[in-house]
Amino acid sequence: MLQQVPENINFPAEEEKILEFWTEFNCFQECLKQSKHKPKFTFYDGPPFATGLPHYGHILAGTIKDIVTRYAHQSGFHVDRRFGWDCHGLPVEYEIDKTLGIRGPEDVAKMGITEYNNQCRAIVMRYSAEWKSTVSRLGRWIDFDNDYKTLYPQFMESVWWVFKQLYDKGLVYRGVKVMPFSTACNTPLSNFESHQNYKDVQDPSVFVTFPLEEDETVSLVAWTTTPWTLPSNLAVCVNPEMQYVKIKDVARGRLLILMEARLSALYKLESDYEILERFPGAYLKGKKYRPLFDYFLKCKENGAFTVLVDNYVKEEEGTGVVHQAPYFGAEDYRVCMDFNIIRKDSLPVCPVDASGCFTTEVTDFAGQYVKDADKSIIRTLKEQGRLLVATTFTHSYPFCWRSDTPLIYKAVPSWFVRVENMVDQLLRNNDLCYWVPELVREKRFGNWLKDARDWTISRNRYWGTPIPLWVSDDFEEVVCIGSVAELEELSGAKISDLHRESVDHLTIPSRCGKGSLHRISEVFDCWFESGSMPYAQVHYPFENKREFEDAFPADFIAEGIDQTRGWFYTLLVLATALFGQPPFKNVIVNGLVLASDGQKMSKRKKNYPDPVSIIQKYGADALRLYLINSPVVRAENLRFKEEGVRDVLKDVLLPWYNAYRFLIQNVLRLQKEEEIEFLYNENTVRESPNITDRWILSFMQSLIGFFETEMAAYRLYTVVPRLVKFVDILTNWYVRMNRRRLKGENGMEDCVMALETLFSVLLSLCRLMAPYTPFLTELMYQNLKVLIDPVSVQDKDTLSIHYLMLPRVREELIDKKTESAVSQMQSVIELGRVIRDRKTIPIKYPLKEIVVIHQDPEALKDIKSLEKYIIEELNVRKVTLSTDKNKYGIRLRAEPDHMVLGKRLKGAFKAVMTSIKQLSSEELEQFQKTGTIVVEGHELHDEDIRLMYTFDQATGGTAQFEAHSDAQALVLLDVTPDQSMVDEGMAREVINRIQKLRKKCNLVPTDEITVYYKAKSEGTYLNSVIESHTEFIFTTIKAPLKPYPVSPSDKVLIQEKTQLKGSELEITLTRGSSLPGPACAYVNLNICANGSEQGGVLLLENPKGDNRLDLLKLKSVVTSIFGVKNTELAVFHDETEIQNQTDLLSLSGKTLCVTAGSAPSLINSSSTLLCQYINLQLLNAKPQECLMGTVGTLLLENPLGQNGLTHQGLLYEAAKVFGLRSRKLKLFLNETQTQEITEDIPVKTLNMKTVYVSVLPTTADF
């Protein structure tokens, strides 16, 4: 049953009801069942950690995924949607370390790995319930029951298989490399992890001296921002090709050597130093210097504390002398290795432990955290006379993405996957992927791939998938395990879990006589696990082998732009290494969601609203649409603003809901008042003659076509603005322009066509918007589907809108010419509105004329066809169309496109710009025709110049106009005041106040009311306006309008005082209508004969009770009144022809159709009299004079629209009704005969009133 739609809606509350509906009918699982045998659409969901609550970044990516997978399902695919959880790695361990106060490996050793991992396992799914609640509340359909977790043994086994494939291909090796190292997490990070969290920091900036052994009065000067690396210094490096100088420091009296180009780093003035010698850097090669500290003097045997040369030393910063600590800098390591200062088998000079503290080798600073030791080191250098300058330096520095602590660079033995040798293949596979936006593939991701480095996959941690390598003590024998079965076979143990506590103790017998092989201690980088998820989530290749291979690569993935150096990268590396192909076909990359001030969202700073509170306040649909309709979907950043979500609710969802509500209201009215059942069947809907119907249907089909194209290309950022714009077009244009039609004011046939059009468009819009706003579309659909003719339904199951397939384009409905015509009309109306706003003239006040000037006669022809809408929307009396600019003083002027021309013309732009602005109207008219013009020797085209119209108000005869234009048209609006128009405007203000009170009372159009009014004092301007516009007001509000006093018997709904143009107006609405209705039985008539159509009324009795009309007389009266001649008439009610024996009184209030014989196509059945009327009450006739009756009805017009009755005619017709044509009468508005109807009261103001008829006495009466 069709439900009435409330005026006010609580979107979050309604969404909760929809969630209950989905749960009750298990809608998500049901849709998966329905699509089971359809083609597969493969989707991979990147696994988040459940150790924290979902934030806006998760919500955004989840919304994109939900939209695309819903779209894929509704496009005819089967889409498995499994949620995944990242359970291992630093995020989990860091939480445990904080909770338990664990500071390093020693603390874990004391606790034991078994207990440590049990602690980690206990918190892995800490917030899983909150995740499930939030994700579900957002409307995302995804399978939590069939999820995957990286801690499942099956998942871990597949990760082992992936690793073994790489190992067998020779892509895995062990090496020492200077890596980003997290001292808080006690583990190295990969290069891409270290790039995820840069911050601007202030570090020490020190200039240190290195006296030469050959002459200790001369010192090299090196610069560093990491003083803590100086105790590990083994060399300095200079550029062999750059110019170096020996100078005398005037103030200090010291002899120093540095790069000439870097003198400014130490000295502001040239007078501060004296250059003694110049020489290339190569001159310094091999010179020895005195070490800063004596901790590693033994390294001198290998050539340490020597000047080395390498071109990596640049002139952009420092002194051109770079201090080398090879185990704390990648370039330092390379250069020292090249000069044999260190070797692969050297004992590392790396006196810093996993927690970032100096070891006992550095005796002066042992146990100090390196960053804290900076001050102590600087103080020691100063005391030793080795410090030249100490300041601070602000620069961008990497922080640990998990612990948010500064990283250090440190050499550690690690396991690597060779990536550098597959860069070309990675780039080729990247080119096979479709990226949205494409720029990410070409720039950010492509550039990252070009510089890809070997991937450190090992972590010196505990809670993770163990790397399945069993090795001999000397690492010469290595066995890589690829499955549980293989390990069971080689170790002889039964295995149920693969975490460290379950496998670390297992040994494998050596095949080379090296005793037992033990597993290495490292676990996998958690990115290796997430990069393996396509295989591991289905336990490939141990299970689902064919299913996986048939569905690989994935059709679609989506994540944030930060994943270009994370999940996107690891997916591509592993798929390329394993199969030589990309892991996905299509990817959408979103930007970052920032706080409103542009800063990163921070729980500590509390600079963003809680997502759950936003959903509770505005609903999930509003949040989804806000995020998706923003730059963030184009991989740009979004500054999250709560008011943006509120505006989506206000500007999109609410107007859309109101259009839906308006449709339902009028369908219910149609059923209640006209007894017409509304059922929509797109196969039987007739083509509407109304141009706006054809336009909105065409516009919708164009939108569907656009939607298909852009969604297939994953361009959500183009689709959403068009959908939102369509909501605006539908609500602010179509519904607004057709309100009267939809209410039935233009006849029922036209009303039904308008309702069918609105229904069709709303249903199609709901189907298109279902992936984007799943809640509101479901809410609307559950009511709309009641009105769909079951015969027309093609989908097998129509319970939910999300079961329906997306609409397909109906080419036969597309009419580009009509779309263009309406677009022209909209431009005119919008230009007119701008003028009204500029002059502060409300739309309620009518204006005389609008002039539309356009160079294209075809455009004016289009505008002409829609003239009545311009009149209604702009409230003007007359539309004038013209191509004659000169008549109205219109000139063309030009403005250059600064961005386009400035970029192209560069220095010549200024002269060209000046000349463009000086082009004459005649020159620009020629440019309009040809599309090209030469200015200052440069050929310019349409895209280079913007043309605009200008209006000279002083030109003769146009002073009353105000103008506004766009690139195509100019409109002139006559804004001179006119009293009749001002009066009408005031009457519209009264209507506005009445309708607002109706809204306050939550009344619907079918609710009967009476409106009472009282102006401040009788005889005022406001009072006279209301009295003279009573009919106009009544026609609009569809309720009787009466002056005070309010009848004591009336039930008052609302009473309010308001100010109108300085006058006070009191309005009262009461329950029920006091309209008397026609006193006599009547039928409405539609006359369709002789090629014309007319409307009118026939009274079946008059006075009441005097029934003399049968079918034959009815046809005769029709022939007489409506001028239908020489035609054999047939009369129909609905589709049934009326016969002679039909009791006409039984048809009272119905609409009959009179034709030339054929049955009508559609009958309007209205219970409201089509023509204006008054009821008559005879007061004082003698009994013998009123044998015909004392109550009658008089039609003020018939046929419809012909109402020329005068006061004398009214007296004559009243006497005629009662058979009193020989008597003189007086007419009154009240029974007490105190308000006589005289000639100065317009007859049309009496519509629907009761007129009291008094018979004047004659001499015979005395």
Curated annotation (Swiss-Prot):
Residues modified to Phosphoserine: 1047, 1049
Motif ('KMSKS' region): 600-604
GO molecular function (one): tRNA binding
Catalytic reaction equation(s): tRNA(Ile) + L-isoleucine + ATP = L-isoleucyl-tRNA(Ile) + AMP + diphosphate
InterPro entries reported in the protein's UniProt record: aa-tRNA-synth_I_CS, aa-tRNA-synth_Ia, Anticodon_Ile_ABEc, Ile-tRNA-ligase, Ile-tRNA-ligase_type2, M/V/L/I-tRNA-synth_anticd-bd, Rossmann-like_a/b/a_fold, tRNAsynth_Ia_anticodon-bd
Binding-site list for ATP: 603
Modified residues (Phosphothreonine): 1058
Keyword presence, Nucleotide-binding: yes
Keywords: Acetylation, Aminoacyl-tRNA synthetase, ATP-binding, Cytoplasm, Disease variant, Intellectual disability, Ligase, Nucleotide-binding, Phosphoprotein, Protein biosynthesis
Lineage: superkingdom: Eukaryota
Motif ('HIGH' region): 48-58
N-acetylmethionine: modified positions: 1
Pfam families: Anticodon_1, DUF5915, tRNA-synt_1, Ubiquitin_IARS1
Main subcellular location: cytoplasm
GO BP terms in the entry: isoleucyl-tRNA aminoacylation; osteoblast differentiation; tRNA aminoacylation for protein translation
Entry's localization field: Cytoplasm; Cytoplasm, Cytosol
A GO term from the CC aspect: aminoacyl-tRNA synthetase multienzyme complex
Record-listed E.C. numbers: 6.1.1.5
Organ and tissue specificity: Expressed in liver and muscle (at protein level).
Function, in words: Catalyzes the specific attachment of an amino acid to its cognate tRNA in a 2 step reaction: the amino acid (AA) is first activated by ATP to form AA-AMP and then transferred to the acceptor end of the tRNA.
Subunit structure as annotated in this protein's UniProt entry: Part of a multisubunit complex that groups tRNA ligases for Arg (RARS1), Asp (DARS1), Gln (QARS1), Ile (IARS1), Leu (LARS1), Lys (KARS1), Met (MARS1) the bifunctional ligase for Glu and Pro (EPRS1) and the auxiliary subunits AIMP1/p43, AIMP2/p38 and EEF1E1/p18.
Noted disease: Growth retardation, impaired intellectual development, hypotonia, and hepatopathy: An autosomal recessive disorder characterized by severe growth retardation with prenatal onset, intellectual disability, muscular hypotonia, and hepatic dysfunction.
HAMAP family attached to this UniProt entry: Ile_tRNA_synth_type2 (MF_02003)
Family (UniProt): Belongs to the class-I aminoacyl-tRNA synthetase family.
Name the UniProt record assigns to this protein: Isoleucine--tRNA ligase, cytoplasmic
Species this protein is from: Homo sapiens (Human)
